[in-house]
């Protein structure tokens, strides 16, 4: 056994890549990478992953270059997930892979884009970014000669669709039809929890976006450090930073407070997860799946503090008038493009026009939705300009 202070023995309930349930389409194994590491590399090399660099979280891309995008967010989630998985003795490759892939189905313009595509697709089966992520990795990415999608391992697919918990209650929704169809052929155990690694990815997502939305919100001038002083978790940490380091300017004070808050949340997840593992006596990955609650979790106190922080962010950031203004503009762009493409599919690019042929209206709508969902913010703005502004002819 290693004497390194950073060595953590493998947990008995960690996923073992040597015992993976495999891929839908059999492939020879790599001599240099585990199956989960191969999945990670396949996700990184997709065009969908690259396009995340110009898809926004809250702010539309043209609002500024310092704000986080889906790509930077995914990288931050992956870093937290890998570190947390390593500290808990889990498979860090699998946790990192699920974290990197969890957002690649998001459309342009953040949640405003998802809301608008859901509205556009209401009569045609709906839209859900989690389902779209699954469709990207199982169908829409076309990089290999023998199959569509990425042919990821069972464990990665399970984690992508179930990282937030069992999804059986969602299967009746029209937007989840693709998941139900896939599950009928390749059972994903949708009524159980996912692996501990997938649960780590979900908590890493919470840790990353809560902290970094605080950072971006102050950077954007939507609220100040003083206004955070009464908010649970961040308030006491901010007070401690100001007391211990009065020499720091506002920027370094903010960054130090965010750094400490990330550390506090990671420590809380580690403590709560180890406590739950001891209480439940889990001894295998299947034991984790068969629990009636999550294994990886925040403590009750931390969960309460986070709920109040999210409420602050919802009021002061996500529904700020500046953000609402860009949301309105973004929704109009997508709605107008969707209507035109559905009515006149021959204005779609050749590849997408070909996909729309020999389909009923619902099928054509899905192709249009897939095309729009894959756009970046900047591309959507430019495409809309070309389609609707006559001055582009001048």
From Swiss-Prot:
DNA-binding recorded as keyword: no
GO biological process: dGTP catabolic process
Pfam families membership: HD (PF01966), HD_assoc (PF13286)
CDD domains listed in its UniProt record: HDc
Domain HD: 70-210
Keyword Magnesium: no
InterPro entries assigned to the protein according to its UniProt record, in alphabetical order: dGTPase (IPR006261), dGTPase-like (IPR050135), dNTPase_2 (IPR023023), HD/PDEase_dom (IPR003607), HD_domain (IPR006674), HDIG_dom (IPR006675), PHydrolase_assoc_dom (IPR026875)
Record key words, sorted: Hydrolase
Amino acid composition bias (Basic and acidic residues), ranges on this chain: 16-34
GO molecular function: dGTPase activity
Region (Disordered): 1-34
PANTHER family the UniProt entry points to: DEOXYGUANOSINETRIPHOSPHATE TRIPHOSPHOHYDROLASE-LIKE PROTEIN, DEOXYNUCLEOSIDE TRIPHOSPHATE TRIPHOSPHOHYDROLASE
Similarity remark: Belongs to the dGTPase family. Type 2 subfamily.
Protein name stated in the entry: Deoxyguanosinetriphosphate triphosphohydrolase-like protein
